UniProtKB/Swiss-Prot annotation:
Domain of life: Bacteria
Lineage of the organism: Bacteria, Pseudomonadati, Pseudomonadota, Gammaproteobacteria, Oceanospirillales
A GO term, aspect molecular function: magnesium ion binding
Residues holding ATP: G101, G103, R104, K123, D135, G136, R186, R193, D272
Name of the protein in question: Protein nucleotidyltransferase YdiU
The protein's role, per its UniProt record: Nucleotidyltransferase involved in the post-translational modification of proteins. It can catalyze the addition of adenosine monophosphate (AMP) or uridine monophosphate (UMP) to a protein, resulting in modifications known as AMPylation and UMPylation.
Reactions mediated catalytically: L-seryl-[protein] + ATP = 3-O-(5'-adenylyl)-L-seryl-[protein] + diphosphate; L-threonyl-[protein] + ATP = 3-O-(5'-adenylyl)-L-threonyl-[protein] + diphosphate; L-tyrosyl-[protein] + ATP = O-(5'-adenylyl)-L-tyrosyl-[protein] + diphosphate; L-histidyl-[protein] + UTP = N(tele)-(5'-uridylyl)-L-histidyl-[protein] + diphosphate
Annotated InterPro entries: SelO
Cofactor(s) annotated in UniProt: Mg(2+); Mn(2+)
Similarity comment text for this entry: Belongs to the SELO family.
Keywords assigned by UniProt, alphabetized: ATP-binding, Magnesium, Manganese, Metal-binding, Nucleotide-binding, Nucleotidyltransferase, Transferase
Organism name: Chromohalobacter salexigens (strain ATCC BAA-138 / DSM 3043 / CIP 106854 / NCIMB 13768 / 1H11)
Length: 494
């Protein structure tokens, strides 16, 4: 998303809380819990600019910084905020669960900015009627991971939620171990999920579903308002955006790991970062979530899961649109995903033109990476240097016999391009990240933050915001992962 010059301060935010004007059982009004000794760890310049805020307004000793700290700790709300927890349902690992909703987070308010609306959602805000058996708290470990994930995905150009700030507190939270508490102020144009529509469909509340469709269109997709069938038009929009989103996940080696329908954004954003991972060694079957024993949400399953989730959403919309028309829209998913994936992978290979056989060239490159156990991200960086160096780095990264034959085909393909080698290298390095949110690096940041040192968090966040540009002295963040990095297990506990 574009970052623009800003001058607003925190107290100048204005809220228009449209969700609170929907039927009362769409939500429950809840006041955030107050946590002991809340301390700000970092404030995101990208998050500030999304809201139209001047990052300088949060400088040390600035009044807005203390106000933000109090907001993160549940000690205050901003004028115009109306905290609430949203109700929704969804399919979790393929099974419908009617008892879902915001269980640890609150929609604090919907800020109106020059670029549209932004939800301010406080994660770790305490228990709600939808907490089920949860304590409503968030831990520092998962909050750091979500904070960095938004920065990393935005830096890569992948649609995502963001965060304005990350804070910790003196609460001790029981998970697999006792962990420090935290709060995260998440930002998104909307938190509407596929599961919101599933809830209304399963409850046979067709009039309320029409209100929800109208709400999403009016708030976020006004160009669809004049459509003959607004629900069908909205579904087509969601299909296209979801296809592009998952294509980007596949191109950049990202595994969401918990693609339940309640974690799917109606706006095509990456939502709810849990046991996600950016792959190290290229492994199409990567499953970073140790609770996903059957690999339902493995890396190579994500495109198919996206289609399945969209089919559930389409079924939910059948009271408002012709089923055949919705099915026709659903058939647009795979071509849209393939087209976007091909575009992204051509760019990663330095190809501007479209030539028959490019898809096979890409697939054969990935086969080499899998055979070699090559690092997915470093291999692309090394390939970018191949045409301007002796290729030694590339041979180190992809040490397999078939590399030479593939490079001969690649060289032949490059003859159909107009760019010279140096220009192509620059273009490739502008889309192939040097700094990647690897699991072991996130763990190092977490351990430092738990020990009271937020400097690695701030440093890594700055690199992830622009992951393509090398910076002096930052070599450790770009180094190859150690062998033990592959044994780190992740869980859904947050």
């Amino acid at each position: 998303m574009p970052l623009r010059e800003v001058t607003m301060t925190l107290d100048s935010l204005r809220f228009d809380n449209a969700w609170a004007r929907l039927p009362e059982d769409f939500f429950t009004r809840v006041s955030p819990a107050t946590w002991k000794n809340t301390r700000l760890l970092d404030i995101s310049p990208r998050g500030c600019r999304a809201l139209g805020l001047d990052p300088a307004c949060f400088d040390d000793d600035a009044p807005a910084r203390e106000t933000l700290r109090q907001l993160m700790g549940g000690e205050t709300v901003l004028p115009g905020m109306a905290p609430l927890a949203q109700k929704y349902t969804g399919h979790q690992f393929g099974v419908y669960n009617p008892a879902l909703g915001d269980g640890r987070g609150l929609l604090m308010g919907e800020a109106q900015t020059a670029d549209g609306y932004w939800d301010l959602h406080l994660k770790g805000a305490g228990q709600t009627p939808y907490s089920r058996f949860g304590d409503g708290r968030a831990v520092l470990r998962s909050s750091v991971r979500e904070y960095l994930a938004g920065e990393a995905m935005a830096g890569l150009g992948v649609p995502t939620t963001l965060a304005l700030a990350l804070a910790t507190n003196d609460e001790k939270v029981q998970r697999e171990r006792v962990e420090p508490g935290a709060t995260l102020l998440r930002l998104a144009p909307s938190h509407v999920r596929f599961g919101h529509f599933e809830w209304l469909y399963q409850s046979r509340r067709h009039d309320d579903m029409r209100r929800l469709v109208d709400h999403v269109i009016e708030r976020h997709r006004p160009a669809l308002a004049a459509s003959e069938s607004p629900a069908e038009a909205l579904f087509g929009d969601v299909v296209a955006r979801t296809a592009r989103l998952i294509a980007a996940w596949q191109a950049y080696g990202f595994v969401h790991a918990v693609m339940n329908t309640d974690n799917m954004s109606i706006l095509g954003l990456t939502l709810d970062y849990g046991p996600y991972a950016f792959m190290d060694a290229y492994d199409p079957r990567l499953v970073p979530n140790h609770t996903d024993a059957n690999g339902r949400y493995a890396f190579d399953q994500q495109p198919g899961v996206g289609l399945w989730n969209l089919s559930v959403l389409g079924q939910s919309l059948t009271p408002l649109a012709e089923p055949d028309a919705l099915r026709d829209r659903l058939t647009e998913y795979e071509p849209a995903l393939q087209q976007e994936y091909a575009r992204l992978m051509r760019a990663r290979l330095g190809l501007e033109s479209v030539v028959e056989g490019d898809a096979q060239l890409v697939q054969d490159w990935l086969t080499l990476l899998a055979e070699a156990g090559a690092d997915y991200h470093r291999a692309f960086r090394a390939l970018g240097e191949w045409a301007v160096d002796d290729g030694e780095w590339l041979r180190q990264e992809v040490p397999v016999e078939g590399l030479s034959a593939w490079l001969s085909r690649y060289h032949e393909r490059l003859q159909e391009e107009e760019r010279d080698a140096a220009s192509r290298r620059d273009a490739m390095q502008a889309v192939n990240p040097l700094y990647v949110l690897r699991t072991h690096l996130a763990q190092q940041v977490i351990e430092a933050a738990e020990a009271g040192d937020e400097a690695p968090l701030v440093e890594f966040r700055r690199l992830l915001a622009d992951p393509f540009t090398a910076r002096p002295g930052m070599e450790r963040w770009a180094a190859a992962p150690p062998p033990q990095a592959s044994v780190i297990c992740l869980s859904c506990s947050s």
